[in-house]
């Protein structure tokens, strides 16, 4: 895909559409057109089948998705799940075998070559590998699509300068790609993707080749571009950290199917599919191995021995929207089950303004003797008044 979009042939076909002068990014906020009702991108029962050496292979199966205008929509899944195929359907590099893909209400599958060129002029593309021309400067790399499209030199210069300011590379205008860091190269790629003032920006694993610190800076840039320009971003990744940092909504793709979708806070706080839970495993506060090895399961109606600590798994999903009152939680547990209540593991995070996470709490039962089912039930009832979900892990 990168080679096709960056090839001279692709740029020349794009240039076949008459050039329309565009405002510089700095003025886009004030001059942005009124929002158009409906989704920016919609997939309606989309299937895609490729011919393979062993026969037909389904890459996508009955995918139905709406991507809201002006948002940042993340698509996540394992390698080979079908994420990049979704992206290729949006810009017409692939045609669906069944169903329809619509961009701003236009069925991409019905467009002829000229229609596809016009569509791609309104879609920016950011790649995992930067695909910069080594013999051209930063400014020349950014301005090349405009030059081929016949944009006058003075206008090209104004547009390139505005984009360099937008991505924080004004001082690198005359530098060559060999002198740039990975993050700087990706900033050039982002600026180049914005030269035609696209309404939609597609990002295909745009940070997977970068170190963690640089990744965060690129994600911050994408979020800033989304806010300042109001364009829709569709972002493909296999990293949940990327989704958490920048996306409003996420779809989880597994073996060609969308198995879960929703606001990022909901999918992270209350994952409903096994594939989602597997992808989130690196972000979940699992019990340390030494503590997990000591946990003993409850034995039906048998009381816990004197001196045991009841372990409660307390979850905040963000559904309530408020701030958790940890003081009230521990006080309620102390009143109902024991003299000493303390946190042994976990942590809380804030996603889209909602607090969520996991806390493992130990309630010591020594002072009141053995604890039977009634006291354990009281502990659960007390904790559930202050959290979204509470379960007993066992005791130590």
UniProtKB/Swiss-Prot annotation:
Its main location: membrane. SUPFAM superfamilies: ACT-like, P-loop containing nucleoside triphosphate hydrolases. The keyword ATP-binding applies. Keywords: Amino-acid transport, ATP-binding, Cell inner membrane, Cell membrane, Membrane, Nucleotide-binding, Translocase, Transport. SMART domains: AAA (SM00382), NIL (SM00930). It is an enzyme of class 7 (translocase). PROSITE patterns: ABC_TRANSPORTER_1, ABC_TRANSPORTER_2, METN. GO terms for molecular function: ABC-type D-methionine transporter activity; ATP binding; ATP hydrolysis activity. One of its GO terms (cellular component) is plasma membrane. It catalyses: L-methionine(out) + ATP + H2O = L-methionine(in) + ADP + phosphate + H(+); D-methionine(out) + ATP + H2O = D-methionine(in) + ADP + phosphate + H(+). The keyword DNA repair does not apply. It is found in: Cell inner membrane. Residues 41-280 form the ABC transporter domain. It is a peripheral membrane protein. ATP binds at residues 77-84. Its EC number is 7.4.2.11. Pfam families: ABC_tran (PF00005), NIL (PF09383). InterPro entries: AAA+_ATPase, ABC_transporter-like_ATP-bd, ABC_transporter-like_CS, ACT-like_dom_sf, MetN_ABC, MetN_ABC_transporter-like, NIL_domain, P-loop_NTPase. The complex is composed of two ATP-binding proteins (MetN), two transmembrane proteins (MetI) and a solute-binding protein (MetQ). Part of the ABC transporter complex MetNIQ involved in methionine import. Responsible for energy coupling to the transport system. Belongs to the ABC transporter superfamily. Methionine importer (TC 3.A.1.24) family. This is Methionine import ATP-binding protein MetN 2. It comes from Burkholderia pseudomallei (strain K96243). The lineage of its organism: Bacteria, Pseudomonadati, Pseudomonadota, Betaproteobacteria, Burkholderiales. The gene is metN2.
